[in-house]
Amino acid sequence: MKQTATRLTSFLFLLLVVSIGISAQRVFNHPGGILSSTDLERIKQHVDAGDEPWASCWKDLQSYSLAQNTYTAKPSAEIGGGGTRQRAASDGYAAMLNAIEWHITGNTAYADCAARILTAWGETLETASAELYQYPCRNMIMAAEMLRNSDGSFYEGWAENDRNTFLTKVRTVMYPAAKKFCTYMNSHPSWYTPAALVVMASGVLLDDAAIYQEGYDLMLNTDHWGQMYGGSIEPSGQMREMGRDNVHGGLTLGDITQACLLAWNQGDDLFAAGDNRLLKGVEYWCRYNTGHPDTPFEPLDCSGLDNSTGFSFYYISMHNNGFRLRPDACCFEAVYHHYKEVKGMDDEKEFPYLTIAARLARPDTANELLGFGTLFFTIDTKTSPYMTEEPAKPQDFRAEDGYKCIYVSWKHPENEDARGFNLYRSTDGKSFSLLKTWDYYTNNIYKDEDVEPGKTYYYKLRLINRAGGSLMSEISSATAQPGTDELPGKWNFAGISSGSYGGGMFTTAQDSTFAVSGLGKDIGGTSDMLGYVYKKVTGDATLTVRLTSTKEAFYKVGVMMRGTLDSRGQSAGLTLGETGYRMVRMFYRTSVGNSTSWINGTNYGYAPMWMRVKREGNKFSTYISRDGDTWYLIGSTTMYMPKTYYVGMASCNGQTSGETYEAIFDHVSLEAEDAAPENVPTAPRGLTAIWTDSCTASLSWQSVEDADSFIVYRSTDNVNFDSIATVSAFKLEDKVTLPGKYFYSVAIQYTRYG
């Protein structure tokens, strides 16, 4: 990391010296925010002519609640803080949209509305110090700039005293607060970039070249995590904050894009900075969010971020879903059109994923920050195509059993032609109803938790885009497994510490699933209090699980090795929980009654998450993974623990009373020296198949003692058999597509020992 930082510093120094020089005597262009007078005139001409897509997008804007000229602001003395900042940001957004409508229609009622909103805040605002004040400040400053004419004058209906009051608040409250925030070197990019943007925009609004230069330099400040490249965006395009969550990465791109637009309208090319670093960041974001979880991510040392030490971002976060097709602040259209139409770059070669995302997401409509990017930035419809053909039929559609849930998945569309889906469900395989519609979302996995344990459900899927829906998928069925409290083999449950209680449940679904309920104060300190599902082993061992619990009602959950079941005993393992339910840390207690030591992993970890704890001699190591294939070491320690010990999964709710928390771990695999069964079960016997109708075969066979599950195979030639299901019962209803002659075979799956 140090070498990379040095190279970046040298590059940026040369860039600043050679490419960036801003005159203190400059004259600003107005309106000079995200839209110039040229942009506004282009929009007006297309809207007046009824051209598409501008006319339809304009109609959408004018029907939007925040774009009404009757909008009333709700000002307060403080502009930041929970609840207040969101409403203040909406007020600023409303003022911006009304100001744009004034330019396009000439109707002063819109300008009057924008002026009323800004005047109300100018008269009321006293401080900008509470949480994330930079967001609403940015919106209001941009809105005020949009109330200007091309000669620099303001809308004449905005009374001079009212206008000056607002401008004074920008100079004395908003700008200083944003500038101060940029001195905090440990903040996230999505917090820093809007603050730097506030400084830049203040300079334009106040016609103050020195302030504008401050903001411009802050965007390129190589010492801060949040500056627009090297900090927010790596040279590869990797978005740093996507290791935190997907949404904040999009927020960062939105603010950098607005800064680039503002600078471009003043004659400065931030778009080109860092070898088109903004384009690389948007392309990276779009690659992941068009449904490509294989997007590479190099782990980052986050020491100092959030005033924390020893934490890292290991992979693109599982938080806030991901796979969203709409970055905030209308940035995908602005970036696409600038690099494609203004700079003439080849979109298919140089930013193919942005091109895919733009084509799928058009037309851009309202979102939390600005939206309407298709209306604002489309220059030529020939270079901005919409989807005109429905998606292809879903492939490899399947439903799979889960513990009290069902997983539905399908293959990512090869033609990149789907932007969402309609999922249908039935309890009889005949009468289907719509279960879920998800638009502007490219994930191809859905977890159905609104199910009755023990019940079988049938599913079918239609992919969607702007042009319509695909052909319906084949039908697939699965059962929400209720689990059993009879744990397999030598697995057991224990409440660690007196007063702790809970229990364990098991099902063969998802390659062996354990649900661990635990009431307990903590994992750590000099003694533990938790629920523990474990197995006694001897020698080296590796426990691998996928933690799937997503309900944030726990304190700490994870994997653990223990020398004894005594609450004060030696232990080593990995937990998720604590602050925000998202801290991942390794723990170890080297001797009975000693304090627990911790090794920080990440403070932005979320389920689903793969976990692993491994013992090799007296060395104990812990790992996490996003996909179960690529693993990242959290920490290792060398300590004594008896050769025979306990390994398993733990859950505690942080309380000494009340309800337990059920942590769910699937794909449980234990590799241990003594983990093999003494006697391998015999093959199932008594297999029978009876046709209950022309396309349904009812299969049954005899129970086998200690078998975990059964794999059912089917063939049409009695030679080549394909696996069709894994079940824990001794029967299966097999629905085939066509009547005919079929052959079946059943084998035992014996996974509990690993």
What is the role of each PLM region?
Residues 24-185, 270-386:
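Extracellular glycan-targeting catalytic surfaces
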Residues 141-240:
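Active-site lining segments of carbohydrate-active enzymes
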Residues 385-418, 453, 465-484, 676-706, ...:
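Pro/Thr/Ser/Gly-rich low-complexity, intrinsically disordered linker/stalk tracts
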Residues 413-429, 704-721:
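Solvent-exposed loop/turn segments flanking beta-strands in beta-repeat/beta-sandwich domains
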Residues 436-442, 723-728:
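Short beta-strand segments within Ig-like beta-sandwich modules, predominantly Fibronectin type-III
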Residues 442-447, 609, 728-733:
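Short S/T/G- and acidic-enriched coil/turn segments that sit immediately N-terminal to beta-strands
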Residues 448-469, 734-753:
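Beta-strand-rich modules
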Residues 481-678:
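Extracellular glycan-recognition regions
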